A protein has these predicted regions:
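Extreme N-terminal regulatory/targeting segments of RNA polymerase sigma factors
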Residues: 1-68, 127-178
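Alpha-helical interaction segments
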Residues: 5, 12, 74, 85-87, ...
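A generic structural signal for ordered alpha-helices
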Residues: 29, 51, 74-75, 82, ...
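Structural recognition of an alpha-helix C-terminal capping motif at a helix-to-coil junction
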Residues: 45, 49, 53, 68-75, ...
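Arg/Lys-rich amphipathic alpha helix in sigma70-family domain 2
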Residues: 53, 102-117, 134
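Short alpha-helix-to-loop micro-motif enriched in aromatics/charged/Gly
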Residues: 57-65, 77-99, 110-115
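Single-stranded nucleic-acid nicking/binding segments centered on His-rich, glycine/basic loops
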Residues: 118-130
Length: 178
């Protein structure tokens, strides 16, 4: 009878062994004042698998910038690989999953900030259009037509309000009380 296939997509024991080997090479390179060793193919594959699988969680699945989130997660894993301590933790899967999770959160926050800037610019655009004169040569070519319907405008204004409210609440929380 065939051995049942493992449901885990990463072998944590092998991942830990590879991390110990990498950490040993990193310590040797540091003592010899050399460049750090290259990350093994297996470690890179693990980072990629963790990031891809985490991107399928319900709280991350529907973002248009999912590839950017995955790239940020892998980049952060490579950046912080030297901080993993096998003497403290024997679970590199959890360590790197957490790094990728917070990279995803940071990317979402960056994208929301960019969307906020875009919406604020669009919100101020009507006031800019009021100061523009349409010449008689333009005729009825539709230059001043609305490009957003009322639902889209409502969503934009709600997003702006929620973003500004969250920002205000965050700044109030940071202020020390007397």
């Amino acid at each position: 009878m065939a051995k049942p296939k493992s449901i885990h997509y990463i072998d944590n024991e092998k991942f830990l062994k590879e991390m110990v080997i990498y950490k040993r090479g990193l310590d040797e390179a540091k003592s010899k004042d050399e460049l750090p060793p290259m990350i093994s193919e297996y470690l890179g594959e693990c980072f990629m698998k963790i990031a891809q699988r985490l991107s399928f969680r319900p709280n991350f699945i529907n973002y248009a910038f999912k590839d950017d989130m995955i790239s940020d997660g892998i980049e952060n894993c490579i950046q912080y690989i030297k901080n993993f301590n096998p003497e403290k933790s024997s679970n590199p899967f959890a360590y790197f999953t957490q790094i990728i999770y917070y990279a995803f959160i940071r990317r979402i926050q960056k994208e929301k900030k960019q969307l906020y800037i875009k919406y604020k610019t669009m919100q101020s655009a009507p006031s800019l259009l009021e100061n523009v004169e349409v010449s008689a040569n333009d005729g009825d070519k539709g230059y001043n037509q609305e490009t957003m319907n009322t639902d889209q405008k409502a969503n934009m204004y709600n997003f702006i309000k929620n973003f500004e409210d969250a920002k205000a609440a965050k700044s109030v929380a940071k202020k020390p009380t007397k």
